[in-house]
Amino acid sequence: MKQFLNVSDIGDLKQALQEARQVKQTPFAWQHLGKNKTIILVFFNSSLRTRLSSQKAAMNLGMNAIVLNINGESWKLETEMGVVMDGDKSEHLREAIPVIGSYCDMIGVRSFAKFEDRDFDYNENIIRQFIEYSGKPVISLESATVHPCQAFADLITIDEYKKKDRPKVVLSWAPHPKALPQAVPNSFAQWMNAADADFVITCPEGYDLAPEFAGSAKVERDQMKAFEGADFIYAKNWASYEHYGQILSKDMSWTVGARQMAVTDNAYFMHCLPVRRNMIVTDEVIDSPQSLVIPEAANRVVSAQVVMKRMLEGLCL
């Protein structure tokens, strides 16, 4: 595996889930693969679960992990080509990336959407430069449009808790005071479609995801109707794709609470975290026995470790 951005990079999902079960049962069984190997985790944006789970996954595999927080610990980096660097950016990615690559065996990169230019964000210009110029395997730790480590962890969690072969999974938009990227819902939709779940997206008008990510998912404007008979509810805010980066609604009736959960088939509640309580979801729901947010977060170590393990195995070939 040379890169991990999309569900296609992981290959057969049944095999990936089986590998995840093995990793979860015996997390230290592959430490020989990571001996004398180093991963550098590059963060352009804040992180809690992604940073810690990636470091833990690397340690489980016997690797050294170096974390670089770009905006607080290094030179400010220019990301666009062809610019005159007469501002506050001291170094260009074109030089920084191969330097970083020379210090490690694989790289993880977190770089959120800027919401300034949809084409720039959806072309994944920053992480694509890491893939092109580093000469090393690259993992998306959430880029402008995708968060594959999160989506893989979500799939692992659903696989662990599902009570039927093809559960009904609902991705529900929920209100938030800030404009949030589409990376998490994009990846969740992409992975649920690939897993052939009974998958429904419910969101207000103007919040449809990009077609390449929504795929064949049914889109339902009526949240209550979408929730009927659901086995898993995944709540998440995202800004508009059509009116790029804009907040079109803060309708609190979309907050996931007991009223909505009552029409499900005793569904589990999921969220990637961090979550705005009583905006995205009520205390009653997130603190209930049906809430999976903590085991879901714990599976971030498992998903990251499967990906890193495969990359290490590729280095040994």
Show the residue positions of the predicted features:
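A short helix->loop->beta-strand "cap" motif at the edges of active sites that frequently abuts
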Residues: S134-K136, A197, A262-Y268
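Rossmann-like adenosine-cofactor binding region
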Residues: E212-S291
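Positively charged, low-complexity intrinsically disordered leader regions
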Residues: M1-L52, K56
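Glycine-rich phosphate/diphosphate-binding loop of Rossmann-like nucleotide-binding domains
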Residues: F44-I66, D159-A235
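C-terminal helix-to-coil terminal segments
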Residues: D287-L317
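Phosphate-coordination loops involved in phosphoryl transfer and adenosine-cofactor binding
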Residues: L33-I39, R166-K168, N266
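Phosphate/diphosphate ligand-binding glycine-rich loop within oxidoreductases
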Residues: G34-I40, S47-D159, R276
